[in-house]
Amino acid sequence: MKELIEYIAKSIVNKPEAVVVTEERSDDSLVLTLQVDPEDMGRVIGKQGRAAQAMRTLLRVMAVREGVRVDLKIV
């Protein structure tokens, strides 16, 4: 899941070298934190939050398969 978010984020930002995804796992949940350059924040969130929502939806689909709860934080 971490690799998917990293791939998507790097493909839409202007500074892909600034993309960092960290992962925190607990028993049945996973929190992914996506850090991007402040100039690229708008691109990652997207118009009316559509890009961020699409990434979260993809994560939920993958999480159902693995039986975990997932959350994406964009900072």
Predicted regions and their residues:
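RNA-contacting regions in translation and RNA-metabolism proteins
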Residues: M1-M41, K47, A52-V75
